[in-house]
Amino acid sequence: GLVDVLGKVGGLIKKLLP
């Protein structure tokens, strides 16, 4: 769902930005 996509994007951003 949309929330799942947002969660994935948020996780990637957290990994890229320490």
From Swiss-Prot:
Proline amide, modified sites: 18
Keyword Cell inner membrane appears in the UniProt entry: no
UniProtKB keywords: Amidation, Antibiotic, Antimicrobial, Fungicide, Secreted
Primary localization: secreted
GO cellular component: extracellular region
GO terms, biological process: defense response to bacterium; defense response to fungus; killing of cells of another organism
Keyword Secreted annotated: yes
Tissue specificity field: Expressed by the venom gland.
Location relative to the cell: Secreted
Family recorded in the similarity comment: Belongs to the ponericin-G family.
Annotated function: Has activity against Gram-positive bacteria and S.cerevisiae. Has non-hemolytic activity.
Protein name in the entry: M-poneritoxin-Ng3f
